[in-house]
Every structure is written in C-alpha cells, then in structure tokens.
C-alpha cells in the first residue's frame, strides 16, 4: 500500500473586523488564534485585494518574520498529521501527539480497528485555561492479529502504532512443485516384457 498522509488544520478567515481601529494596540488579545500562526504575508496581500474590505488585517512586519514565527508555523504544519505506512511485513501509523503526556494517551483495538484517544483536563497557560482531546481510528489490514499491535511514544511527541502482517499476506502465492521422474510403465503387467518362446515339441 502506498504511503498516505492525512493532514488537518483550522483556517482563519473572518469576513469582517469590528476592532480594526483598535489594532495594533490590543492585537495580542485578538491574535492569539488559539495557538495558530498568522497567515503568511502573500496570503494576507492576496485576501486584502480580493474585493472583501476588512477581510484580513494588514500584518505588521514583525508578525511574519523572525524565528518565533517560523517555529510556530513549522509546528502548526507538522501538528496533527497522521502518516500510514505498510511495508512487505509491517503496518505502521505515526501520529503527532506532542500536546499529550503518555498517561493521557490510550491505544486499543476492537473489531479490527485501532483507536487512539488523547485527553488532558483543563489546565492554565499564558492566555487562560485550555483543554484538549482527540480520537483517531484506523482499520487494520485483513488478517492482522490484534494482540500483536504495539505502540511507542518518541521524545518529540510522535506516537507510533505498528503490527506485523500475517505471513499469508507477505509471502508470494507462487509455489514451486518438484518434478519427479518415473520410468514408463509397462503395459500388460510384469509378464508383458517377457518374449513368448515357441513351444518345442
């Protein structure tokens, strides 16, 4: 099976901005965007000329430059991405769960489906209180033994769930049949090979 990526993200797109006269003095309050980085400059310029005045505010240069923005954008683009791989002998799913501790993650199998759940209770951050939860389900390939499914969490926050594929699915269906050699059978039984002798009188 070919590699398949399943990204998801949230798009910011307010159709109007009642606080544009208040910006940028209080921009920090309204531009938190719940952890999402601002739109890249070229998107902002395109949207501001799209015929929808006020659709997107002009962004200050500081908002789109610098390592902090690059790190935030990199994290957002890499967050929440699920990657499924299937090799000749293994099936594997990798999922970015960097916001969750190991004890906040649950991996279980039921009816040929792997279910990954993450949840942490409400906690305080620099902007207030936040809670997160998610559930992802993946169908196991036919014949996979659910008791052999294993999972591991990397220090970078990548959860890997994998299982060996059954032998019947990984081995070729081609079977070599040995050829045995037999001498040609003699017709008429063992006595047929004897030449008949004329009877002497």
UniProtKB/Swiss-Prot annotation:
Gene Ontology molecular function, alphabetical: identical protein binding; protein folding chaperone; protein homodimerization activity; protein kinase C binding; protein kinase C inhibitor activity; RNA polymerase II-specific DNA-binding transcription factor binding; unfolded protein binding
Domain sHSP: 72-180
Modified residues (Omega-N-methylarginine): 12
Record-level GO cellular component terms: axon cytoplasm; cornified envelope; cytoplasm; nucleus; spindle; Z disc
Modified residues (Phosphothreonine): 170
Subcellular location: Cytoplasm; Nucleus; Cytoplasm, Cytoskeleton, Spindle
Residues recorded with modification N6-acetyllysine: 119
Free-text description of this protein's post-translational modifications in UniProt: Phosphorylated upon exposure to protein kinase C activators and heat shock. Phosphorylation by MAPKAPK2 and MAPKAPK3 in response to stress dissociates HSPB1 from large small heat-shock protein (sHsps) oligomers and impairs its chaperone activity and ability to protect against oxidative stress effectively. Phosphorylation by MAPKAPK5 in response to PKA stimulation induces F-actin rearrangement.
Keyword annotations: Acetylation, Chaperone, Cytoplasm, Cytoskeleton, Methylation, Nucleus, Phosphoprotein, Stress response
Broad class of where this protein is predominantly found: cytoplasm
Region entry Interaction with TGFB1I1, spans: 68-201
Gene Ontology BP term (one): cellular response to vascular endothelial growth factor stimulus
Residues modified as Phosphoserine: 15, 27, 74, 78-79, 82, 94, 172, 195
Subunit note: Homooligomer. Homodimer; becomes monomeric upon activation. Heterooligomer; with HSPB6. Associates with alpha- and beta-tubulin. Interacts with TGFB1I1. Interacts with CRYAB. Interacts with HSPB8. Interacts with HSPBAP1.
Family: Belongs to the small heat shock protein (HSP20) family.
Function: Small heat shock protein which functions as a molecular chaperone probably maintaining denatured proteins in a folding-competent state. Plays a role in stress resistance and actin organization. Through its molecular chaperone activity may regulate numerous biological processes including the phosphorylation and the axonal transport of neurofilament proteins.
PANTHER family in the cross-refs: HEAT SHOCK PROTEIN BETA-1, HEAT SHOCK PROTEIN HSP-12.2-RELATED
Name assigned to this protein: Heat shock protein beta-1
Organism, as annotated: Bos taurus
